[in-house]
Structure formats: structure tokens, C-alpha cells
A protein has these predicted regions:
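A short, exposed helix-loop element centered on a Lys and neighboring polar residues
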Residues: 102-103, 156
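The beta1-alpha1 cofactor-binding region of Rossmann-like NAD(H)/NADP(H)-dependent oxidoreductases
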Residues: 18-19, 40-53, 84, 203
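Catalytic loop of short-chain dehydrogenase/reductase
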Residues: 73, 113-163, 175-176, 229
Length: 242
């Protein structure tokens, strides 16, 4: 909705939530007057991933200028329980799919232009939704964390490889929405125990997207919108030391 309000035509990817995606498309069309389409794909199947950018471009009638890699599998495992299935599901959805989409996106972005000062202006922007935990590692969610660490590396290396015509950045949310398997008490404790004593809200994630859309000189960066969760330092090895 935010992107449509800023003048973008929007392609929405979904896997199983067809009804919700269709409702969002109709809302965007009715409230903003911008074109929008919903496209189904299983991001663990590369053949479906490879077609997404082309399908979106054809449906919207032109090249795609902004790619937001937001879809993610987030399931618990640890060093003892991680197996081939959990590894593949997390790597395929959180790392392989963004790589393939990045490749497809880069192949269709219009040629670079220059501003009035003769300096190049990027014509494409990729935003990868990562996780603040790449800045604050724990032994929990092993496959997920490794996949997101890989996506952070991909963000930086693709920013190098695709410059100057495409900028690539990342956003690392903290406790924003309660997880499906998370208790209300645990979620509230997560939020209040950040450095700022508060979590983030969806509107703040959107604000970070807005900043990256406008910041023509920013690439290869990670913005943690997490209440400072990644800076948490009150651990047993520090507390009580004078």
C-alpha cells in the first residue's frame, strides 16, 4: 500500500494466501488507482522463482524498478536438530530465492541515467528483509540464522557487483509482530528488554523502506529497526562487574 501511494504499480507474491493477496490487490486498486497483481510461486522451487520477475513485468507492463525480498520460512531448529529438510527449506526460501530473483531483476533494469551534475543515478533498488539476529548471534534457529547471514553477505556483495545502476540494501526487523508459535508474554518481554525498551511497529519498517527509496547514495547497508535489540549487552559476564 505504501509503495502504491508513492506511485508504484505493485506485484504481490504469495504462496498459499491467495484470498488475502487478492483482497490486497483490490484494496490497492480502489484506494490508490494504481495497478496491482498477485502472483503465486513456491520459493523453494527454483523453476517458479525464475519466472516471477518476468511475470510481474508482463502483468504490470514494464520493467520492475524495486524488488523487496520479504518472504521467509522461519522454523525452529538448533545444532542438534537441524537436518537436510530444515536446512533446505530455509536456504531455498531465505537465500537461494533472493539470489535468483536478484539475477532476474538485474537483467531487466533500465540503463543508468545521470543527474544534472553528471553523476549516475541508480535505476534499480533491492531491499532484503533480514533479521537483527545477524548482528547478535545465538545458537537458536540454526538453519534460519545461517540463511539470513548468507542473505546479508549477498546484500553486500551484490551491492558491489550491481553498482552503480542497482542499489542493494537490507532491513533487520526486531520484535515487530507476535510469531505464530510465540506467547503474548514472551513477545512483550522481547519488546521491553530491548535497549530502547520497545519493539518496532510495521509503520517503522515501512519508513525504512521509504528512506532507502530516497537515499540515492546508500547501498550495501543494513538498517536494524529493532529498538536496539541487536545492541543488548546486559549479560551475566558483564553485570555485576565494577
Amino acid at each position: 500500500i505504501f509503495l502504491a501511494e508513492r506511485g508504484f504499480e505493485v506485484a504481490i507474491h504469495y504462496h498459499s494466501s491467495e484470498s488475502s493477496a487478492d483482497k490486497l490487490v483490490e484494496y490497492i486498486k480502489s484506494k490508490t488507482g494504481k495497478n496491482s497483481v498477485a502472483l503465486r510461486a513456491d520459493l523453494t522451487k527454483e523453476v517458479e522463482v525464475r519466472e516471477l520477475i518476468t511475470r510481474a513485468s508482463e502483468k504490470l507492463g514494464g520493467p520492475i524498478s524495486c524488488l523487496i525480498n520479504n518472504a521467509s520460512i522461519f522454523e525452529y531448529d538448533n545444532i542438534w536438530t537441524a537436518n537436510r529438510e530444515s536446512w533446505d527449506r530455509h536456504i531455498e526460501s531465505n537465500l537461494r530465492a533472493p539470489l535468483v530473483l536478484t539475477q532476474s531483476f538485474a537483467n531487466q533494469v533500465p540503463s543508468i541515467i545521470s543527474d544534472d551534475n553528471g553523476e549516475p543515478v541508480s535505476q534499480g533498488l533491492i531491499i532484503n528483509l533480514i533479521d537483527q539476529r545477524v548482528k547478535k548471534l545465538t545458537p537458536e534457529f540454526t538453519s534460519y540464522t545461517i540463511a539470513k547471514m548468507g542473505l546479508w553477505a549477498l546484500t553486500q556483495t551484490s551491492a558491489q557487483a550491481l553498482a552503480p545502476n542497482i542499489r542493494v540494501n537490507a532491513i533487520g526487523p526486531g520484535p515487530t509482530l507476535k510469531g505464530a508459535r510465540q506467547s503474548e508474554e514472551h513477545f512483550e518481554n522481547q519488546r521491553k528488554n530491548t535497549v530502547l525498551g520497545r519493539g518496532s511497529d510495521p509503520s517503522e519498517i515501512v519508513a525504512a523502506v521509504g528512506y532507502l527509496l530516497n537515499a540515492k547514495s546508500v547501498t550495501g547497508q543494513l538498517i536494524c529497526v529493532d529498538g536496539g535489540q541487536h545492541l543488548a549487552w546486559k549479560t551475566p559476564d558483564v553485570l555485576g562487574v565494577e
